[in-house]
């Protein structure tokens, strides 16, 4: 037998030993210490307690009276919580939920059970949301939990406009309030929001907080306030407070000219699962700012995740769900010519994008695995609808709903029909799901589906967008009746893209003006609402040609599409045809700007003096 074989660890023996200790505990065999909490006795083994708890290790090894006692009374400890920790000590299983985790953390902190503390920290960080972030910030500060504190603070900054009215915000300590109000990362579009939050906190308990008037108001960047707000605010103050306020505002002057992070937000087109410009990877995630005409790199979804569903909520939170990941231990080549060499596994992953950190944060997974599910946000909940899956037709009908406050998924009424592909939008708190020439409407309050008017054309893989009380169904592949043959949308030569409009008030479809496109192009149309206008992002060239992208804008009154913007090929490379496209507000300073690229062809490839560059004809200068 080799030396390596002799040193192998028998994990089965370790598990068996733990199981035997558990049986000794349950049968009260060989116990040598009794913990007493609130009149409840817990016979235990000193060795087990000392192994998991620094508190008990110090107690039993100190040589003091407690080390010789057979009964120890514990103060300020809950009996039910102690039972959870003891069970963990003997089994490694930790039972916790939203109602017990904070008490469990407090007890584990007192008993110095580091493993339990770490598990509780991870649980709480995962559960942070707009409803509890302020309270968890105070909780983390109380127990000096820096990791939890920073995560909670980032959520407070991100959701500031939603949380500063909460009672938990009114009860923040002075130091925590200053830490928040002084932050450059507050997601506010106006400094008036910060001023209002500061005044609400001060007025919550005027008598005890008047001493903090100057220090609190010094965090307000007065130069960012409108002149009307400055004048009205100062004139409305009591005479005794005016000098204090003036001193406080004077202290804030060095920060006058630095905007909050939320003031730098730009509305961007977000491309998930676009073809990568890096030949060593298949996909990339980028965003394009139409105002700045710049492309920024987003953190790609974890574990090479692709074929996901995407959604941006009204609160500007970005989520992705479902998709596929490469199987582990398979020969994987990430080059673009080796897609078929990799085996994939369908997953139920669900991620939230932390825009400050430019990273994807895992949330509770969906109940079903899904490929390219339709994701929408309706009445504060996120719905995952259909999608392709390994469960066949039955699974394609399933619909589940995510509660952002509870971080949990529940099933709702299934789709009336099963489809491999569908598009979904939300209008007037109702969800409209479309495929081929069919459309169904889901009413969340009654949890029911109703079939709506059929479209005039049968198309799949189209792009849909809601604009006001209208739904636009754009592009896609025509399905020939009874044949299943798919033809490009629009005219025979592909020189336009078909558009249909649905009026939710009249329950009727009508044809709209087609979108112009170059002959034989491959549009890859994506409908979006940007700058309060309905637009389409599309490719003007065939996939075999150099990629050239444009955006068109629709005029509802004139029923006309007009060119909004040409996008330089030096800015945006070939995105492929399977990318997801949505619109959200992001912070340029938190993103990595994509480097400038020279034109694909610096000179004409055929030697002529005139050639096309970025959509324009360019002539070589005379020699």
From Swiss-Prot:
Signal peptide: none annotated. Residues 133-229 form the BACK domain. It holds the Pfam family Kelch_1. Pathway: Protein modification; protein ubiquitination. CDD domains: BACK_KBTBD2 (cd18479), BTB_POZ_KBTBD2_BKLHD1 (cd18270). One of its GO terms (biological process) is protein ubiquitination. Kelch repeats lie at residues 317-380, 381-429, 431-469, 470-529, 535-581. The keyword Repeat applies. The modification Phosphoserine is found at residue 300. Residues 31-98 form the BTB domain. Keywords: Kelch repeat, Phosphoprotein, Repeat, Ubl conjugation pathway. Substrate-specific adapter of a BCR (BTB-CUL3-RBX1) E3 ubiquitin ligase complex that acts as a regulator of the insulin signaling pathway, modulating insulin sensitivity by limiting PIK3R1/p85alpha abundance in adipocytes. Targets PIK3R1, the regulatory subunit of phosphatidylinositol 3-kinase (PI3K), for 'Lys-48'-linked polyubiquitination and proteasome-mediated degradation. Component of the BCR(KBTBD2) E3 ubiquitin ligase complex, at least composed of CUL3, KBTBD2 and RBX1. Interacts (via the BTB domain) with CUL3. Recognizes the BCR (BTB-CUL3-RBX1) E3 ubiquitin ligase complex substrate, PIK3R1, through the 4 tandem C-terminal Kelch domains. This is Kelch repeat and BTB domain-containing protein 2. It comes from Pongo abelii.
């Amino acid at each position: 037998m080799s030396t390596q074989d002799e040193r192998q660890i028998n994990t089965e023996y370790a598990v068996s030993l733990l199981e035997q200790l558990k049986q000794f505990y349950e049968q009260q065999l060989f116990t040598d210490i009794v913990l007493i909490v609130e009149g409840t006795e817990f016979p235990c083994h000193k060795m087990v307690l000392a192994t998991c708890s620094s508190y008990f290790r110090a107690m039993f090894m100190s040589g003091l009276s407690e080390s010789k006692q057979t009964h120890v009374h514990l103060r300020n400890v809950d009996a039910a919580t102690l039972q959870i920790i003891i069970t963990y000590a003997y089994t490694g299983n930790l039972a916790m939920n939203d109602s017990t985790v904070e008490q469990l953390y407090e007890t584990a902190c007192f008993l110095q059970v580091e493993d339990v503390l770490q598990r509780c920290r991870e649980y709480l960080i995962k559960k942070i949301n707009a409803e509890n972030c302020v309270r968890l910030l105070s909780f983390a500060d109380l127990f000096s939990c820096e990791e939890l504190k920073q995560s909670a603070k980032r959520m407070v900054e991100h959701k500031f406009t939603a949380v500063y009215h909460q009672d938990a915000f009114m009860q923040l300590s002075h130091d925590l309030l200053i830490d928040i109000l002084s932050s450059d990362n507050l997601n506010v579009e106006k400094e008036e929001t910060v001023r209002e939050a500061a005044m609400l906190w001060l007025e919550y308990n005027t008598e005890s907080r008047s001493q903090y008037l100057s220090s609190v108001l010094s965090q307000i960047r007065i130069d960012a306030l409108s002149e009307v707000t400055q004048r009205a605010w100062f004139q409305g103050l009591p005479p005794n407070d005016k000098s204090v306020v003036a001193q406080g505002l004077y202290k804030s002057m060095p920060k006058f000219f630095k905007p909050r992070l939320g003031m730098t937000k730009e509305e961007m087109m977000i491309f998930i699962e676009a073809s990568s410009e890096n030949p060593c990877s298949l996909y990339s995630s980028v965003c394009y700012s139409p105002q700045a005409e710049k492309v920024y790199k987003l953190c790609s979804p974890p574990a090479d995740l692709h074929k996901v569903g995407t959604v941006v909520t009204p609160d500007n939170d970005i989520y992705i769900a479902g998709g596929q990941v490469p199987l582990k231990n398979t020969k994987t080549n990430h080059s673009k010519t080796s897609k078929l060499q990799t085996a994939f596994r369908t997953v139920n992953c669900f991620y939230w994008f932390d825009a400050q950190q430019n990273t994807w944060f895992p949330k509770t997974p969906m109940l079903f695995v899904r490929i390219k599910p339709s994701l929408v946000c309706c009445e504060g909940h996120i719905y995952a609808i259909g999608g392709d899956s390994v469960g066949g037709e039955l699974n394609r009908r399933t619909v589940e709903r995510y509660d952002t406050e509870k971080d949990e998924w529940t099933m709702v009424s299934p789709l009336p029909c099963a489809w491999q592909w569908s598009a979904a939008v939300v209008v007037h708190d109702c969800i409209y799901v479309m495929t081929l020439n069919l459309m169904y409407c889901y009413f969340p309050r009654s949890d029911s589906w109703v079939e709506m008017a059929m479209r005039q054309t049968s198309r799949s893989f189209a792009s849909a967008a809601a604009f006001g009380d209208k739904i636009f169904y754009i592009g896609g592949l025509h399905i020939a009746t009874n044949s299943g043959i798919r033809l490009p949308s629009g005219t025979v030569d592909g020189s336009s893209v078909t558009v249909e409009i649905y009026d939710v008030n009249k329950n009727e479809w009508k044809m709209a003006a087609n979108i112009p496109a170059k002959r034989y192009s491959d549009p890859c149309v994506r409908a979006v609402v940007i700058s309060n206008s309905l637009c389409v992002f599309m490719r003007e060239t065939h996939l075999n040609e150099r990629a050239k992208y444009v955006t068109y804008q629709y005029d509802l009154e004139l029923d006309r599409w007009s060119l909004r913007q040409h996008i330089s090929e030096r800015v945006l490379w070939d995105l492929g045809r399977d990318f997801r496209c949505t619109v959200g507000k992001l912070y340029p300073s938190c993103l990595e700007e994509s480097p400038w690229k020279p034109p694909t062809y610096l000179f004409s490839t055929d030697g002529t003096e005139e050639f096309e560059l970025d959509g324009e004809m360019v002539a070589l200068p005379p020699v």
